[in-house]
Amino acid sequence: MFKGIFIKNFFNLIINQGINILIALLATRILFSTLGEAQYGLVNLALSVVLLSSITVSYGYHLNGPKRIALFRDESAKKETLINEIIATRIIIAFGMAIILFCLTYFFGFFKSYAALLYYSLILLFSQALFPMFYFQGNDKIAWASLVNAFAKGAYLLLIVLFIKIPEDATYVNFLFGITALIVYIVTWIIIYKKE
């Protein structure tokens, strides 16, 4: 049984990473040709700053979260309390990191050349806070993670095609990335809570 779950999860993770690579390649081609070299570089710079900051948002929870979820698999009240604690803590940390980045930019002049782009990118911290991978890993439901990821990335790619038309739209690229993930993750958590 364990071997079957391991193989299934392994292939689902491969599919998940394949989707990530495919969407990244398509988005890169579209964004680079639409935004130009300079704006595309700033988009990725802002994305890098926020993603590095988001490490603190998920710090430790991607390791101990699945283990603790697995321990409470058959105890729905304890599992729900644990999920609430993890999500609440991650959201509080996301707010803290957003405030720190805002203050560094607004008051101290860090990231000044792409401040607006960075502000719009802060939503990625909150989408990271709601990322349900720890839940799927703890319940051996990696296929769900692949499905959620595919939906979020597909919606992001569609929004890029629809709304990113000129170099000045660079400000909104990371916002679209964050908002699609955030909405998909909120809907996913609603479904999870209804099923639990």
Regions of interest found by a model, annotated:
Residues V57-D74:
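Helix-loop junctions and terminal segments of transmembrane helices
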Residues L35-A46, F72-N84, F95-F126, I166-V173:
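Membrane-interface helix-capping segments at transmembrane helix termini in multi-pass transporters
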Residues G4-H62, A98, L157:
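Signature of the first transmembrane helix
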Residues G18, L22-L25, V57, L63, ...:
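Alpha-helical transmembrane segments of multi-pass membrane transport and lipid-handling proteins
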Residues A24, T28-F32, I55, L101-T105, ...:
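Structural signal for membrane-spanning alpha-helices in multi-pass inner-membrane proteins
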Residues Y119-L122, S146-F163, P167-K195:
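Hydrophobic alpha-helical transmembrane segments
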Residues Q17, I21, S48-L51, A94, ...:
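Residue-level recognition of pore/gate-forming positions within transmembrane alpha-helices
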Residues K3, A115, L125-V148:
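Membrane-interface junctions at transmembrane-helix termini in multi-pass inner-membrane proteins
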